[in-house]
C-alpha cells in the first residue's frame, strides 16, 4: 500500500550525498508539481531558491481542465476552463475526484450526478467519455486526463528552464489510499515523467513553511483545504528534520462542494420563482457554476456579491445576490466538519491545543473567513500563520524536495519522516483484522509476526492484506491476496509462518510470508492490481498521449498553412483595391484576372475550412502562379515583387 510518504532520510550521510551526486547527471532538473483537483502548480529549485513558474497565460496556477473542441483541438488549462460554458459535455475537470477509485465508490456515484461530462463504467472503474471532434467518441481513464494536466505543467517548466524535464516530485492528499497514489504515479508515467517521489500535500506545505525556521523544535498543524480535498497533518520540525506525527482528513471535501451547495440553493430558488428546472440545461448549470465560484471568491473580501447571468435559461436573465451570511449558512455543516480531523490529529499525537506552535493554512478554500474563524476559535484565539501563499505552498515544498532529489546542495540537510495514514494488517480466523503496522507509524518501516495454520494438514495458507481501522476485515479495504503453498502435513497450530510487512520510502508495501520449517517463501508487492492500470494499458496510454501531442502539432501546422493562404489572399485583395498600391498600376485585364483568382481562393477557403495542409499549400501555389507573372511584368526587374506577404510576415493571426 502506498502510504503517506515522503523522502525519508536524505542527505544524511556523505555516502548518500555522493550517490545523489552520481544521480544528478541522470535526472536533470527535477520539478515539483502540485496536481490539484481544481488547479495545479509547478515549481523548481534553482540558484538556491524556489521559483513558482507562470504558464503561457502568465498565471502561476493552471486550471486542472482538459477540453476537446468540435474542431478536434485539445485544450488544457486556462483555455479549457474558459470555454466550459459553451462546451460543457467535452470539458473535463475533477479527474482527481475519480482517480484510483472504483465505479461503485459512493463518492463517485455522487459526483457523476453533477459532472457535465459523461462518466461510464469500464473494468469496474470510472472512465470519462467525450467527443474528441469530427463525431469521434473516446473514453479516457482519469489517469489519462491527469496526465494531460501533468504534461501541461511539464511544458510550462520546460519553457521556463529552456530544456527537457523528465523527473518530478508530485504531491497527493495525505489521506489518499494506495490505489489513488499508484494511479497518480501512473498518470506521471503517461505524461512522460519519472515520478521520483509522491509526497503528501501538507508535508510539502510544512517544508515551504519551515524551511527558514530551523531553530528549536516546533509543532506545526497544517490545515489544507483545497478545491476537492481536505487534509490535516501534525508535524514536528527540529533543525531541518520534518516528522509527520499524525494525519487525517477527507479526500472528498473542498471548495467545489461549497460551490455545489450554493448552486443547488439558486437552482431551487429559480424553480420556485419561475417554475423552470435549470438542471435540464447543462450550459446553464455550467454558467451558474462559473458565476457562483466568482461570487464565493468575492465574499472572502466583501459581504455580498451579485450573480448576473445574461440569457441564463430559455433566453431569460438571472440576477440574484449572495451574502456572506447566506453562503456560510448553506455550508455551515461542511465548515464545521473540518474541525473533526483537527481534533483527531491532536488525539493521535497526544498533544493539547496549547502545544501547537504554528497553524499553517494551505489551499484556496482557507481564504474563506468563516474557516479562518473556526480554526482560530478551535485553538482558543491563536492566529494562523500568514506568511505563505495558500495556492503555491504545496508546489513550493514539492520543489524543495525535488531540489533534494536532484542533489542540490543549497537545500541543506532536509530530512522528511512521513507516516502511513491507515493501519495495515492481515485477515486471521473469523475475519478478524490482525494489525501489523498501526496507522501513523513513521515510514520506511518493517514489522514481522508469526502465524500458524487453522486446520490439521493444511497445505496452503492464504494471506489477505488489508488497510483500515475497523476490527473486522469486511469493513476494511482489501489491498491484495497471495498463497503460501507446500506446507508439510502437520497438526493445526504447529507450522510457523512468518509474515513480514515492509514499507519503502515511497510508501509501497511489500508483504512476505515464509514457512520457517521449510524456508519456502512467497511475497506480494501491493499495487492494487484490481484497481490499477496494467502495464499494457499504461503503455497504450503513453502512446495515445504521444499521438495527441502529434495531432496537436499537425493541427497547428494545418491552421498555420490555412492562415498563410488566407493572409496572402486578403493582402492581395486589399492591394488590388487600393489605387495607391497595386490597384492603380494594373491593366484592367490583369486586375480582373487577379481579382477573379483571389475571390476564387477566398470562396474556396470559406467552404474548405477543414482541408488538409497539402490542399492549402497547393491553393496558395496556384494563386502565386497566377499573380507573380503579372507582378513581375509590372515591376520588370526593379527589385523583388511584392508577394502580398510583406505585411503579414512574422505575425500570427489573432
UniProtKB/Swiss-Prot annotation:
Record's disease association: Autoantigen in rheumatoid arthritis.
Entry's Gene Ontology molecular function annotations: ATP binding; ATP hydrolysis activity; ATP-dependent protein folding chaperone; cadherin binding; calcium ion binding; enzyme binding; heat shock protein binding; misfolded protein binding
Protein name as annotated: Endoplasmic reticulum chaperone BiP
UniProt main location, coarse: endoplasmic reticulum
Gene responsible for this protein: HSPA5
Keywords: Acetylation, ATP-binding, Chaperone, Cytoplasm, Endoplasmic reticulum, Host-virus interaction, Hydrolase, Isopeptide bond, Methylation, Nitration, Nucleotide-binding, Phosphoprotein, Signal, Ubl conjugation
Gene3D superfamilies: 1.20.1270.10, 3.30.420.40, Actin, Chain A, domain 4 (3.90.640.10), Substrate Binding Domain Of DNAk, Chain A, domain 1 (2.60.34.10)
Domain of life from the UniProt record: Eukaryota
Subcellular location field: Endoplasmic reticulum lumen; Melanosome; Cytoplasm; Cell surface
PROSITE patterns the UniProt entry points to: ER_TARGET, HSP70_1, HSP70_2, HSP70_3
Biological source species: Homo sapiens
List of residues that carry Phosphoserine: 86
Region described as Substrate-binding (SBD): spans on this chain: 420-500
Amino acid at each position: 500500500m502506498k502510504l503517506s510518504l515522503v523522502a525519508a532520510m536524505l542527505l544524511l550521510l556523505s555516502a548518500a550525498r555522493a550517490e545523489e551526486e552520481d544521480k544528478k547527471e541522470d535526472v536533470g532538473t527535477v520539478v515539483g508539481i502540485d496536481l490539484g483537483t481544481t488547479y495545479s502548480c509547478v515549481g523548481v529549485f534553482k540558484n538556491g531558491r524556489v521559483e513558482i513558474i507562470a504558464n503561457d497565460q502568465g498565471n502561476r496556477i493552471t486550471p486542472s481542465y482538459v477540453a476537446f473542441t468540435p474542431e478536434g483541438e485539445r485544450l488544457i488549462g486556462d483555455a479549457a476552463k474558459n470555454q466550459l460554458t459553451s462546451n460543457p459535455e467535452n470539458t473535463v475537470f475533477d479527474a482527481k475526484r475519480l482517480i484510483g477509485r472504483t465505479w461503485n465508490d459512493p463518492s463517485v456515484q455522487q459526483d457523476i450526478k453533477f459532472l457535465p461530462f459523461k462518466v461510464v463504467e469500464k473494468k469496474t472503474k470510472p472512465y470519462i467519455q467525450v467527443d474528441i471532434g469530427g463525431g469521434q467518441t473516446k473514453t479516457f481513464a482519469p489517469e489519462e486526463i491527469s496526465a494531460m494536466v501533468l504534461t501541461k505543467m511539464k511544458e510550462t517548466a520546460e519553457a521556463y528552464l529552456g530544456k527537457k524535464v523528465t523527473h518530478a516530485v508530485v504531491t497527493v492528499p495525505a489521506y489518499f489510499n494506495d490505489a489513488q497514489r499508484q494511479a497518480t504515479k501512473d498518470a506521471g508515467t503517461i505524461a512522460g515523467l519519472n515520478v521520483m517521489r509522491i509526497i503528501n500535500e501538507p508535508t510539502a506545505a510544512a517544508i515551504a513553511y519551515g524551511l527558514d525556521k530551523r531553530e528549536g523544535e516546533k509543532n506545526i498543524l497544517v490545515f489544507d483545504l483545497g478545491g476537492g480535498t481536505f487534509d490535516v497533518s501534525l508535524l514536528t520540525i527540529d533543525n531541518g528534520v520534518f516528522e509527520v506525527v499524525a494525519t487525517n482528513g477527507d479526500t472528498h471535501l473542498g471548495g467545489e462542494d461549497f460551490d455545489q451547495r450554493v448552486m443547488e440553493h439558486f437552482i431551487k430558488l429559480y424553480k420556485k420563482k419561475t417554475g423552470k428546472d435549470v438542471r435540464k440545461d447543462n450550459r446553464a448549470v455550467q454558467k451558474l457554476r462559473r458565476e457562483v465560484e466568482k461570487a464565493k471568491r468575492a465574499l472572502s473580501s466583501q459581504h455580498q456579491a451579485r450573480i448576473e447571468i445574461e440569457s441564463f435559461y430559455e433566453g431569460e436573465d438571472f440576477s440574484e445576490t449572495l451574502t456572506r451570511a447566506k453562503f456560510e449558512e448553506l455550508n455551515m455543516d461542511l465548515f464545521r466538519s473540518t474541525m473533526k480531523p483537527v481534533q483527531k490529529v491532536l488525539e493521535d499525537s497526544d498533544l493539547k491545543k496549547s502545544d501547537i506552535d504554528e497553524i499553517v493554512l494551505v489551499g484556496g478554500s482557507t481564504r474563506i473567513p468563516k474557516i479562518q474563524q473556526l480554526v482560530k476559535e478551535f485553538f482558543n484565539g491563536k492566529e494562523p500563520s500568514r506568511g505563505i501563499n495558500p495556492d503555491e505552498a504545496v508546489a513550493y515544498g514539492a520543489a524543495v524536495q525535488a531540489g533534494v532529489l536532484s542533489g542540490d546542495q543549497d537545500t541543506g540537510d532536509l530530512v522528511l519522516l512521513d507516516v502511513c495514514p491507515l493501519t495495515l494488517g492481515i485477515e486471521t480466523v473469523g475475519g478478524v483484522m490482525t494489525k501489523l503496522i498501526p496507522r501513523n507509524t513513521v515510514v520506511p518501516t518493517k514489522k514481522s509476526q508469526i502465524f500458524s495454520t487453522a486446520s490439521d494438514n493444511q497445505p496452503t495458507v492464504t494471506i489477505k492484506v488489508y488497510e483500515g481501522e475497523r476490527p473486522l476485515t469486511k469493513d476494511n479495504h482489501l489491498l491484495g491476496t497471495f498463497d503460501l503453498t507446500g506446507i508439510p502435513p502437520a497438526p493445526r497450530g504447529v507450522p510457523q509462518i512468518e509474515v513480514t510487512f515492509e514499507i519503502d520510502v515511497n510508501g509501497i508495501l511489500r508483504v512476505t510470508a515464509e514457512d520457517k520449517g521449510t524456508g519456502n517463501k512467497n511475497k506480494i508487492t501491493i499495487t492494487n492490481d484490481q484497481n490499477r492500470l496494467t502495464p499494457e494499458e499504461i503503455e497504450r496510454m503513453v502512446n495515445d498521449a504521444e499521438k495527441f501531442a502529434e495531432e496537436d502539432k499537425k493541427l497547428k501546422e494545418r491552421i498555420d498553412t490555412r492562415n498563410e493562404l488566407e493572409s496572402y489572399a486578403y493582402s492581395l485583395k486589399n492591394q488590388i483595391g487600393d489605387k495607391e498600391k497595386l490597384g492603380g498600376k494594373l491593366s484592367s485585364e490583369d486586375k480582373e484576372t487577379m481579382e477573379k483568382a483571389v475571390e476564387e481562393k477566398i470562396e474556396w477557403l470559406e467552404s474548405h475550412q477543414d482541408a488538409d495542409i497539402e490542399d492549402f499549400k497547393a491553393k496558395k501555389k496556384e494563386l502565386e502562379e497566377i499573380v507573380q507573372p503579372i507582378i513581375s511584368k509590372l515591376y520588370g526587374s526593379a527589385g523583388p515583387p511584392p508577394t502580398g506577404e510583406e505585411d503579414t510576415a512574422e505575425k500570427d493571426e489573432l
